[in-house]
Amino acid sequence: MIIVSTELNKISKRLTQDPSQPASQAMMYGAGFTDEDMKKPIVGIGSTGFDGNTCNMHLNILAGQVKGSITRGGMVGLGFNTIGVSDGISMGTEGMRFSLVSRDVIADSIETICEAHYYDALVTVVGCDKNMPGALIAMARLNRPSIMVYGGTIHSGHYKGEKLNIVSAFEALGKKVAGTITEEDYQGVIKNACPGAGACGGMYTANTMASAIEAMGLTLPYSSTAPATSEKKKAETLALGKAMMHLLEKDIKPRDIMTFEAFENAIRVILVLGGSTNAVMHLIAIAKAAGVKLTIDDFQRIGNTTPLLADLKPSGKYMMEDMDAIGGVPSVMRLLAKHNLLHLDCMTVTGKTVGENLKEAQDLPTDQDLMYAWENPIKQTGHLQILYGNLAPQGSVAKITGKEGTYFEGPARVYDSEEAVNKGLEANEVKSGEVIVIRYVGPKGGPGMPEMLKPTALLMGLGLGNECALITDGRFSGGTHGFVVGHITPEATEGGMIGLVKNGDIIRIDAVNRVLEVKISEEEVTKRRAAWVKPAPRATSGVLYKYMKLVSSASEGCVTDN
């Protein structure tokens, strides 16, 4: 039962109404508060906006629109910024080690300002991959009325009649190395892949997490698919004031929404849409912050009864803007509900349940081919497969859409860093039929568990994407496609079996039986383990050093507050 709250400023009044806090009040009056403002609820508006990348460059504008809506709704909106890392910019460089780290820095910084300044509620305006889980972790920790606004997806780029996206630019390098693209066309792809503001446009990590969070009920409906520069996105920001006041009046908090059943809804949606492997660790981390027990095995359990239906990039042909045109996530959720695969009684930030929200949505159109028919799916079960075996006794995450097959066996080609594998690919070291092993790039080994999009994109561009497999204790971008297995746990730096693999060892990847193993004898394992020496840490000070000391394994969500 939802109780109507009569004290909407019950947190901020510690500063605004307490006569023993004159200095607090003096500073607030100095910042422009009126006597009436001191009685109103204070809503923090946290933006990850910053210049120089398409995912985040417009977020401060959206945050300004949110602030206006909050003010008109009878509250005080206080804007603040936190950081972000552009995966697209840092990918393939040492800078990528800071990407996953940024998730926890975002969460910590939002928690810090909201706790220190006694905000009654929170709106987060976020864009790139780690922004969303960082914001949700903070919301769960704070447990004050909260809404996330997704910055929105980018529109497609175009060059010589071809639709482009950010992965087009990554894969163009492989084509250049292979000699299948001219320098002029290479530059043409680069300069036309990203036409303006918005997050990377396929079912990559940003759009995956936005879809998951909308399915959980922490955004307004259609937030995940509305393009960044659309009128629909602007309308979303202008609706925030009314929505937030309703949450405050009903005292609906994130943990009322972030139930185990809500996480199951989120997983179901990203599986049917073909979402990123990163969703596994991010949802586990968010669940931990919310006090919900979620494990990698829950993804497998749900995936066993969830078909892959969406023909979205990276493995398909459509973009998120196309998903928006056919009804967005609510229409997909209506389809799942018809097959009794959703929990419809979960609460959302609209103040209504999932089921009540879906009554206002439309069914998917019959004249579209983005979403396959239920009876004729792309894959009968989920594309995110949890593999175990002697290479991953604590689990790993494979992204198998079915287009690349379900079984691969071949000799290992081992690299101890992403830089080494990229050089090897550009030098044509990798041969058809091999399993590329990239290790010492896990959460502690990286440190920071960087994404391996550059090598997988090079493989695709070289024409080896369907002829090789790639396994790693690092991560993959949502833009990765091909026969790939990541999040191998334990990681090499922690003595994991992946650190003992040698060139030529036969590696077996069986997505049907969910097995990841290297075919060597126990005697050989014992011999190699005795000879193994833990490498020196790659960070000895600063944020990467702190992260390396605190971070948990990939299977546990890479959290830093265990």
Curated annotation (Swiss-Prot):
Q: Which GO molecular function terms does the record list?
A: 2 iron, 2 sulfur cluster binding; dihydroxy-acid dehydratase activity; magnesium ion binding
SUPFAM superfamilies attached to this UniProt entry: IlvD/EDD N-terminal domain-like (SSF143975), LeuD/IlvD-like (SSF52016)
Top EC class, one word? lyase
- Kindly state a single biological-process term from the GO annotations of this entry: L-valine biosynthetic process
Q: Where in the sequence is N6-carboxylysine found?
A: 130
The annotated active site, in chain numbering, is: 477
Q: Where does Mg(2+) bind?
A: 87, 129-130, 451
Any binding details for the cofactor? Binds 1 [2Fe-2S] cluster per subunit. This cluster acts as a Lewis acid cofactor.
Cofactor dependence is on: [2Fe-2S] cluster; Mg(2+)
Q: What are the binding positions for [2Fe-2S] cluster in this chain?
A: 55, 128, 200
Query: Which reaction does this chain catalyze?
Result: (2R)-2,3-dihydroxy-3-methylbutanoate = 3-methyl-2-oxobutanoate + H2O; (2R,3R)-2,3-dihydroxy-3-methylpentanoate = (S)-3-methyl-2-oxopentanoate + H2O
Membership in a protein family = Belongs to the IlvD/Edd family.
Assembly with partners or alone: Homodimer.
What does it do? Functions in the biosynthesis of branched-chain amino acids. Catalyzes the dehydration of (2R,3R)-2,3-dihydroxy-3-methylpentanoate (2,3-dihydroxy-3-methylvalerate) into 2-oxo-3-methylpentanoate (2-oxo-3-methylvalerate) and of (2R)-2,3-dihydroxy-3-methylbutanoate (2,3-dihydroxyisovalerate) into 2-oxo-3-methylbutanoate (2-oxoisovalerate), the penultimate precursor to L-isoleucine and L-valine, respectively.
What is this protein identified as? Answer: Dihydroxy-acid dehydratase
UniProt organism field: Cytophaga hutchinsonii (strain ATCC 33406 / DSM 1761 / CIP 103989 / NBRC 15051 / NCIMB 9469 / D465)
